[in-house]
Amino acid sequence: MNVAIVGATGYGGIQAVNLLKNNKNYKISFLGGNKTSGSKWNDNFPFIYLDTDPYIEKISVENISKNSDVALLCLPNGISSTLTRKLLDRGVKVIDLSADYRYKSLVEWEKVYSKEAVAFKRNDDDLCKEAVYGLPEINKEAISNGRLISCPGCYPTSALIPLVPYLSQGIIENEGIVIDSKSGTSGGGREPNQKLLLSECGEGLSAYGLINHRHTSEIEQVASLISGNKIELLFTPHLVPISRGMHSTIYGRLRDPGLTSDDCRILLDNYYRNFKNITVLPVGTFPSTKWVKNTNQIFLSVKVDIRNGRIVILSVIDNLLKGQTGQAIQNLNIMSGFSMDDGLELTNNFP
């Protein structure tokens, strides 16, 4: 199967090339990047060497579609929407890593991504409704039948995977959910950003996007769908001075305050026992971002505060892999009829 990587020179695209270059199921048919178009891949990224040393090409529907079955769109918010319909019309399936199709309503997207809505005059509400939310652990069947997959954001991935088992079974209350997340600097992308300079963020920790971070509504949309009730929650992201990795701590109130840590761990373990990339830790073992660096793995831990009937769930992911491109490859595998984790048997080089 021929795969186009559009936006190949950003962090997401670079990860995609690295994951697909030796994958027997796929052939990289196109590498797109406007700023570096006309130059050879190996000159730009000698550390991800490609035997064919292809040219990086200008991004256009014609260039993408001429030899491709699927396009991975690793692009800033808004740009994917200018390409998607035309690619679909040419028979190219689309896996979008931006937020353009994460909402079932274009109106909702325009509320959350208001700056992009001004810059990109969209008229594709039908595609918003068609797009499948690409969280493989909860949406595998729909992904397998889809032609447009919208990959979740990194924060929503780290929050929803721990939450879904408890929301879907009514274990926790719909009100009072709090998500506290920390992310490495690569989550901000590869474009220059003063806040991500080493001298600005090194040896420090800071919150950002307080109350109104864009991923809040994305988490709420999926959580509400899973629970069958409208959910409003509190989400606070933080920037930590590591290159990659994400740690989320989720707090909720148990409907049955008699449930123990062991009860909640068993429930979590049973829910994800068939997923190779998810490890549910013993009660009292708490995960570190170091454990998942450069892998598509997720580590989960849960503990109950019996004094007040609250549950605390921890999750760690690599924000560039399970939080972005690794998850896109899972979706690609499912769409293509392969095992979900093919090509993602990645080993952590601890420490």
Curated annotation (Swiss-Prot):
Pfam families: Semialdhyde_dh, Semialdhyde_dhC_1. Gene3D superfamilies: Dihydrodipicolinate Reductase, domain 2, NAD(P)-binding Rossmann-like Domain. PROSITE patterns: ARGC. CDD domains: AGPR_1_C, AGPR_1_N. It is found in: Cytoplasm. Keywords: Amino-acid biosynthesis, Arginine biosynthesis, Cytoplasm, NADP, Oxidoreductase. Pathway: Amino-acid biosynthesis; L-arginine biosynthesis; N(2)-acetyl-L-ornithine from L-glutamate: step 3/4. Its main location: cytoplasm. GO terms for cellular component: cytoplasm. InterPro entries: AGPR_AS, AGPR_type-1, NAD(P)-bd_dom_sf, NAGSA_dehydrogenase, Semialdehyde_DH_NAD-bd. The keyword DNA-binding does not apply. One of its GO terms (molecular function) is N-acetyl-gamma-glutamyl-phosphate reductase activity. It catalyses: N-acetyl-L-glutamate 5-semialdehyde + phosphate + NADP(+) = N-acetyl-L-glutamyl 5-phosphate + NADPH + H(+). Its EC number is 1.2.1.38. SUPFAM superfamilies: Glyceraldehyde-3-phosphate dehydrogenase-like, C-terminal domain, NAD(P)-binding Rossmann-fold domains. One of its GO terms (biological process) is L-arginine biosynthetic process. The active site is at C154. Belongs to the NAGSA dehydrogenase family. Type 1 subfamily. HAMAP family: ArgC_type1. Catalyzes the NADPH-dependent reduction of N-acetyl-5-glutamyl phosphate to yield N-acetyl-L-glutamate 5-semialdehyde. This is N-acetyl-gamma-glutamyl-phosphate reductase. It comes from Prochlorococcus marinus (strain MIT 9312). The lineage of its organism: Bacteria, Bacillati, Cyanobacteriota, Cyanophyceae, Synechococcales.
